[in-house]
Swiss-Prot record:
One BP term from GO: transmembrane transport
Ranges that cross the membrane: 18-38, 48-68, 78-98, 115-135, 136-156, 188-208, 228-248
Coiled-coil ranges per UniProt: none
Role played: Probably part of a binding-protein-dependent transport system. Probably responsible for the translocation of the substrate across the membrane.
Location in or out of the cell: Cell membrane
Keywords: Cell membrane, Membrane, Transmembrane, Transmembrane helix, Transport
Membrane topology: Multi-pass membrane protein
Protein name, as recorded: Putative ABC transporter permease protein MJ0413
Disulfide bridge positions per record: none
Length: 267
């Protein structure tokens, strides 16, 4: 009986794996066929040319350092902006979600600033911080801040009332309810905000690195390679960006599935 169940599980996993890789594989085949048909690497390079860039990550490329060097620089910028956004957005979101007065005070300003795209802040960022790291980190901060904040507020406001009433019945007071009931119960929503914020932060760093203030990073390398008509390098950088974004998302989803399984059971 156990062997039969294992066999079914292996079949399901194999089918799921095939489904997951079939579309990317088809995209690669179409890409290669189009590249052969166009026969112009400036418009669309062959798959082999891009792979050749990817399999030499430690080699210097176009005089801008290696792929690894530029990737690490971009990751450091994302971490800085993302951690700063989390450090501000999570406490503020908890306060706005739990205290009506704080929400009334901050809500109008937040809703006014939230629709503004991160790249619209670029002129102000350059004016405030100059041509340096802080201008790029600020753009990343703006991109990650609002998804984390909104999900935190939503999570705190969405804590079931019976849960709070039960804590009150057991003698818990305002601060204890916030720390021991509200924050743990809203953690899944906060994590969702972190997942969305991380994705946007990663997109923002690439855009920020295309600005005049940058001389390294994947975004800078994309623009520099484009100026030299090296589309193989451009696509290689795009693939790295996509892979890192995928790893970030899957990592946070794994944490959500592993430690917040009770949330799915409640639904």
């Amino acid at each position: 009986m156990m062997n039969h169940k294992k066999g079914i599980s292996v079949k399901i996993n194999t089918k799921e794996l095939v489904l997951k890789i079939s579309l990317p594989a088809l995209a690669v085949v179409i890409w290669e066929l189009l590249a052969i048909y166009i026969n112009n690497p400036v418009i669309l390079p062959r798959v082999e040319a891009v792979i050749n860039v990817l399999i030499h990550p430690f080699q210097g490329i176009l005089g801008t350092g290696s792929l690894i060097d530029n990737t690490i620089i971009s990751i450091k910028r994302v971490i800085s902006g993302f951690l700063l956004a989390s450090a501000v957005a999570i406490p503020l979101g908890i306060l706005m979600g739990y205290y009506r007065t704080v929400n009334s005070l901050c809500d109008t300003l937040i809703e006014l600033l939230r629709p503004i795209p991160p790249l619209a802040w670029v002129p102000l960022s350059l004016a405030w911080f100059g041509l340096g790291e802080m201008s790029m980190i600020f753009i990343i901060f703006i991109g990650a801040f609002f998804p984390i904040l909104i999900n935190t507020i939503s999570g705190v406001k969405g804590v079931p009332t019976p849960l709070i009433e039960a804590a009150l019945t057991l003698g818990a007071k305002g601060r204890d309810i916030l720390i021991k009931v509200v924050i743990p119960a809203s953690s899944p929503s906060i994590l969702t905000g972190l997942r969305v914020g991380a994705g946007i932060a990663w997109m923002c760093v690439v855009a920020a690195e295309m600005l005049p203030s940058s001389n390294a990073g994947l975004g800078y390398l994309i623009m520099y390679a484009y100026s030299l008509s090296r589309m193989d390098v451009v696509i290689a950088c795009m693939i790295i960006i996509g892979l890192i974004g995928l790893v970030l998302d899957r990592g946070l989803r794994y944490i959500e599935d592993k430690y917040f399984v009770w949330r799915k059971m409640m639904k």
